Amino acid sequence: MNGTVSRRRTAVRTALASLTATALLAGCGAEVEPSGSGVQKVTVNRCGEPVEYTTPRRAVVYEGGSADKMFALGLTEHVHGYVMPPANPPVTESPWAAEYAKVKFLSDDLLNRELLVEAKADFVVAGWNSGLSDKRGTSPEILDGLGIQSFMHAESCFNYPNHPERHAPFDGLYTDLERLGQIFGVQQRAATVVADMKRRVEAVRAQAPSTRTPVFLYDSGTDQPFTAGRQVPPNDIISFAGGRNIFADLDGRWTQVGWEAVVQARPEVIIILDYQDQPAAQKIRFLKTSPKTKNLPAVVNDRFFVLDYNEGISSPRNVDGLEKFAAYLRDLRS
């Protein structure tokens, strides 16, 4: 699982802005060091490790979830460009399509060190083993040595070997928005965005039935299915909507299981994670024709819910996915 606003201010306004940012950051528990150049330095946790960030000017974002977090906070002018592998749906389908149009498309390949250096990036937003990795020369340590700051999705810190940090998936989303708000000095905006998300989530949870529907998330795979453990957003989407992830007992993120375990759990609903390069229709066709799965209750009753890829990875769109899936479950019960 698989930006720069150069504003001319008077000296007085710059000083006032720095003081305001300092006060806001202090209230969020971050340490800030004002700079006379209009650039702010702030210490924020990165997977449990205190890291000093300087206000980024040329951010590169990897996949839709990273871009959407920046756009949701109104930080488009700080984004130089985006890297979007083939699994991601077209950016024209995003709620932030207009923001994508304002920044550069850099590549449809995996994130790599050469791309970041060529883009003259000073900041990258990605997940551990989803953009950031030792293998591709994009670990935080390597990027630090190149003068490129890195921000890891809190949800992905579960797998980060150096400074692991655990967050429930939706809590990780809120944490990311709050931390990005600190780094870019838009804490109040982040607080407003997070508060609205929490309000929407609680509205869904208030309507969730007490009887939980067993749900299987099908990511990919035919010999062995790839699915969601309890450390990724679909687990919270299923739970908050009134379902029960049949693999919620797996303390992991995206993981392989055996078809025998799926058959034994007898899911009544199957969520299909819809990749651009692995369409949902193709996966549904496999489930309906495979001897291993064609007799599952969800398959027999044609109970498939298609979850957009960017609603399934850590992203502000997780809440959209939750609302849609909750409505689907309510319709099944009506």
Predicted segments with their positions:
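Bacterial Sec-exported substrate-binding components of ABC uptake systems
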Residues: 2-21, 26-68, 179-217, 329-334
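Short helix-initiation/N-cap motifs at beta->coil->alpha
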Residues: 44-47, 103-114, 134, 250-259
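A short, structured surface patch at a secondary-structure boundary
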Residues: 62-63, 67-119, 123, 128-132, ...
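Solvent-exposed loop/turn segments at secondary-structure junctions
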Residues: 65-68, 85-88, 123, 129-133, ...
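Extracytoplasmic ligand-binding site segments that recognize negatively charged/polar headgroups
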Residues: 88-89, 130-138, 148-179, 212-233, ...
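Alpha-helical, coiled-coil/dimerization segments enriched in small aliphatic residues
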Residues: 90, 227-254
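Short helices/loops that flank or line small-molecule/ion binding pockets
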Residues: 112-123, 141, 146, 257-266
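Structured C-terminal subdomain patch of bacterial secreted/periplasmic proteins
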Residues: 167-176, 249-250, 269-334
